[in-house]
């Protein structure tokens, strides 16, 4: 498996197929996509998992994290999150957060994210905000 940075155009089809197949493809576009960092995991040369990070200085937000159904449960998403977390820490991001579907809370907890606040809904799907704070590395 190979994890690398990819383009917005590459992530959109997987976002649509996995996250919102009953919506229009444009529903899967996010303001800020052009300046976001998009990660992709390839298995056998095929893009199978995507995640997008919107970095605002020392704060970063994960959005539109999706793995093709036939590749779920194989640890691919875990490796993508581990890779982007390493990058964020290297960039001295101190606060990382996402809106997590309630079905995925335990997945994000593996990376130290904790629930913040109350459950809320987007397009009839239940979510919680989850976040983690990291100590910044001293500048040398």
Protein language model features and the residues they cover:
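Conserved beta-strand in the GNAT
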Residues: 40, 46-54, 61-66
């Amino acid at each position: 498996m190979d994890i690398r940075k990819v383009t917005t155009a590459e992530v959109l089809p997987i976002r649509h197929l996995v996250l919102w197949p009953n919506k229009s493809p444009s529903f899967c576009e996010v303001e800020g996509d052009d300046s976001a960092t998009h990660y992709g995991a390839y298995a056998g040369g095929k893009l199978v998992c995507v995640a997008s990070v919107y970095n605002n200085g020392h704060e970063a937000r994960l959005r539109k994290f999706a793995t093709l159904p036939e590749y779920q449960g194989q640890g691919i998403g875990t490796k993508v999150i581990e890779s982007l977390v390493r990058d964020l820490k290297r960039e001295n991001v101190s606060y990382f957060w996402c809106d997590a579907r309630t079905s995925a809370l335990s997945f994000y907890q593996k990376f130290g994210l904790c629930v913040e606040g109350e459950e809320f809904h987007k397009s009839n799907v239940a979510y919680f905000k989850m976040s983690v704070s990291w100590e910044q590395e001293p500048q040398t």
